[in-house]
Amino acid sequence: MTVLQQPADLDDACLRARAVAAARGDARFDVLVAGGTVVDVVTGECRAADVGIVGALIASVHAPGSRSDADTVIDAAGAYISPGLIDTHMHVESSMVTPAVYAAAVVPRGVTTVVWDPHEFGNVSGLAGVRWAVDAMGGLPLRAVVLAPSCVPSAPGLEVAGADFDADAVAEMLSWPEIGGIAEVMNMRGVIDGDPRMTAIVEAGLKAGKPVNGHARGLEGADLQAFVTAGVSSDHELVSGDDLIAKLRAGLSIELRGSHDHLLPEFVIALGTLGHLPQTVTLCTDDVFPDDLHRDGGLDDVVRRLVRYGLKAEWALQAATLNAARRLGRADLGLIAPGRRADIVLFEDIRDFRALHVLANGRLVASGGGMLQAPVAAGVSPLRHTMKIEPLTEDDFRIAATGSTARVVTIDRPRFTRWGETRAEVSGGYLVPPKGMTLIAVAHRHGRADSRPRVGLLEGWGEWRGAFATTVSHDSHNLTVFGSSPRDMRVAANAVIEAGGGMAVVAEGKVEALLPLPLCGLVSDAPLAEVAAGFAAIREAAGRIVEWQPPYLVFKACFGATLACNAGPHQTDRGIADVATGKLLESPVLETF
């Protein structure tokens, strides 16, 4: 954890002198927010007060109506006044839009700061992709604390991404002043077992005096203790209320994430048993799909849902503001108080956080749900032309085998995967997938290894009547195709290749839906409404070609099927990989008869 600090822009002597004079009553405020109710996230009070602002500073929080001398007065009658929301762990790329478009979506909803792990861009475009992410955030009304991706790829030796980040690469990123720490460390076993590469990466963060953020999915007991002792200080991969409490007790800063909505009620109950909100609990979105972002928002939606599930509204706001600011080591953020930065949200209902007006750095930047001025987008040419793969054939999606029968391994279940085994017929030199099995193929698309698809068998993925292809495929983002028919899989894959990356749904040889994502195969430079509609069409089309097998009804499972850093078998561009054992099978065929 870094020491609480005040960024240099607030230490300007003239600014401070003006603010002090205004606080004394010897000078006018630049802006006065008058007639509202301040949500005090320190005391838990909601109290009537006016807020005087000079430049980017809050100069005074004083009795309502006691001052009227200001260049601009914002009428806050009937409104609550809160610090701007801080999202402590997220990936802009998950929303499939550029940073400028993302900012225009969340700032009018009250989100003024995000902690961005651009490891999706890093996995495709390497250091250049991370540098682009940093530069693209410059000048936006949304403040971004950008982190240095720590696990590119997530499982070295088991997959090939578009780059490899060793300790030297991470140290280089940490030397950039805009980089606020090391992003989620997903190679848990590497840290726990003292792998030299991961040990050096964590040490680079500690040496730089910047936080090392975690990904502690499923860790408990001695493994959890070892992970934290190694220097990791946060986690968002919570699987239950008991897991939340155990990780609080381990001293981790918690990022309660909205992307796993089914767990939020359990977290609310767990926090209720404590009787108070620990100061190490913050909130994050992690991943928000474009249609969800367009309809529901970002961190503001997480706040609303937590309150709906029974969390005190004051606690939810404290977690999303003051606690988050302390986690970031930012003394200037997270509080409506003199001397703090004027990131301020006015909203109507404390139980249904809907922003009326948003100020960032003391300037009114959004009102009535929209930006007052559109954010300026960065150039995107460095992110184009990342599909370094030729069109594929039907045979690329078949599993070669000899004899008449084969013993094969399977990947059982979409989540918390485990090894399975079955027998399958062989015909014409190829495996005949058993009934109820789904084919998954992953083809390297970054030009750093051979691009022949590695094909495996999935159990528990329902009945498929077509194919789905995507280059959004965590975390190496190789071309991944699901389906039951090699013909449909070929059509889907080649549609995505031709589009320069993205997603396609195919049925009976016809493309039913296509979403081009030409920037790293992850993001579009189109407006949010257009991307949201395109992704919604993909969801709808996918729902027509597959009957999900309960309880796995979440389309999101497709994008995590290749996340090789998680325990259990996962298909990658090198084969079927298991990070816990280091096992890697190029083919699912064990033996033939």
Swiss-Prot record:
Keywords: Hydrolase, Manganese, Plasmid. Its EC number is 3.5.4.2. InterPro entries: Adenine_deam (IPR006679), Adenine_deam_C (IPR026912), Amidohydro-rel (IPR006680), Metal-dep_hydrolase_composite (IPR011059), Metal_Hydrolase (IPR032466). GO terms for molecular function: adenine deaminase activity. Its cofactor is Mn(2+). It comes from the Bacteria. It is an enzyme of class 3 (hydrolase). Belongs to the metallo-dependent hydrolases superfamily. Adenine deaminase family. This is Adenine deaminase 2.
